[in-house]
């Protein structure tokens, strides 16, 4: 008989969970408190009210009680449930607040959720799936993955994680890595621009008017500080912007208010393993100027936080509270305005 997950979780103490998967899979990952043995071994042990869990494709004796969806079903349920329950305040509420406060989704939008395979974009996909089920504003979603030339095992990891999390991905191929591997200068900058161009182009080809990227709160404040320290200017990563090269297309960042540490907590709680940077250049190079600057900025923020716990939020809020009368100059629509222009003697 099939025992539904909700019933099991509600009445855990009534069952003894028997995991019949192979030993290697069990040792790699299992439900706490479960016993690894075969159905026959469980019968020999005369375990009271055993509930069997295996692979979703396993065929069970009709006389056995087995968990709906198998081990994969349990992992999916736990990952989805933890977004709206255990980490509701840290993830779900921050996501919906960003969508609302920054007006990221409008009626009848068709959004391409761009998945790189990392923790941020995978979580974003699950948040969109949850929002799509409950939103009062009608919108459509495509979950797209651009393969810039990943090694086979990296591509497989993305596909396996999408299957495990029940994300209906669409994969399209490019050879961006081959192009940037041959560049001597600024490969990361060029790679990022090429990626975005391909994402915009593919999204538009399937009828989307927006692409969603997985940049989070920490990305935004690091970018703010980097622009000052390394670029000699004041600007930040906005929660949305219109494309300059693809008319009618817009980029949105729904994770804008979510802290990276909370994404990591969700990932680790669910024992998920996502793709890290799989760039050929990063793997082959001893130094990466763009990445090292971001890392240095991240360390600086961490150091400042030791004496000022509010430093991260203060950096974030500084971009909402710019006093134009108290700056030497600023640009608006490519026109430079200097403080002396309106200074009266």
Regions found by a protein language model. Give the residues of each.
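A short, well-structured beta->alpha microelement
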Residues: 1-9, 33-43
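Flexible, polar/low-complexity N-terminal or interdomain linker segments that lie immediately upstream
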Residues: 1-28, 72, 76-86
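Conserved beta-strand elements of the Class I
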Residues: 16-18, 51, 112-113
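Catalytic cysteine-centered active loop of the rhodanese-like fold, especially the PTP/DSP P-loop
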Residues: 37-71
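ATP-dependent adenylation/nucleotidyltransferase module used to activate substrates
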Residues: 82-226, 230, 261-262, 268-269
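Catalytic subdomain that performs nucleotidyl-dependent activation
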Residues: 140-141, 219-300
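The feature marks non-catalytic terminal segments
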Residues: 272-345
């Amino acid at each position: 008989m099939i025992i539904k997950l909700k019933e099991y979780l509600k009445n855990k103490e009534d069952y003894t969970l028997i995991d019949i998967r192979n030993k290697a899979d069990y040792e790699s990952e299992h439900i706490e408190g479960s016993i690894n043995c075969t159905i026959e071994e469980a019968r020999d042990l005369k375990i009271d009210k055993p509930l069997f869990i295996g692979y979703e494709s396993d065929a069970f004796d009709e006389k056995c009680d087995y968990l709906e969806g198998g081990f994969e079903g349990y992992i999916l349920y736990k990952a989805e449930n933890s977004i709206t329950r255990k980490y509701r305040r840290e993830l779900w509420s921050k996501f919906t607040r960003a969508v609302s406060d920054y007006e990221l989704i409008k009626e009848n939008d068709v959004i391409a959720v761009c998945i790189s395979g990392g923790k941020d974009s995978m979580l974003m996909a699950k948040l969109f799936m949850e929002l799509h089920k409950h939103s009062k504003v009608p919108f459509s979603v495509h979950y797209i993955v651009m393969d810039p030339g990943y090694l086979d095992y990296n591509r497989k990891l993305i596909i396996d994680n999408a299957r495990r999390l029940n994300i209906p991905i669409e994969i399209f191929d490019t050879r961006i890595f081959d192009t940037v591997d041959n560049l001597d200068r600024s490969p990361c900058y060029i790679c990022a621009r090429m990626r975005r161009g391909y994402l915009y182009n593919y999204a538009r080809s399937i009828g989307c008017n927006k692409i969603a990227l997985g940049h989070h709160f920490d990305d935004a404040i690091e970018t703010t500080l980097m622009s000052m320290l390394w670029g000699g200017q004041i600007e930040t990563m906005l929660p949305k912007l219109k494309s300059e090269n693809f008319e009618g297309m817009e980029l949105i960042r729904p994770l804008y208010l979510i802290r990276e540490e909370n994404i990591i907590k969700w990932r680790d709680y669910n024992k998920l393993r996502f793709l890290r940077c799989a760039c050929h250049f990063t793997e082959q190079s001893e130094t990466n100027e763009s990445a090292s600057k971001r890392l240095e900025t991240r360390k600086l923020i961490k150091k400042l936080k030791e004496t000022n716990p509010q430093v991260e939020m203060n950096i974030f809020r500084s971009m909402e509270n710019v006093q134009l009368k108290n700056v030497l100059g600023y640009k608006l629509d490519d026109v430079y305005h200097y403080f002396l222009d309106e200074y009266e003697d």
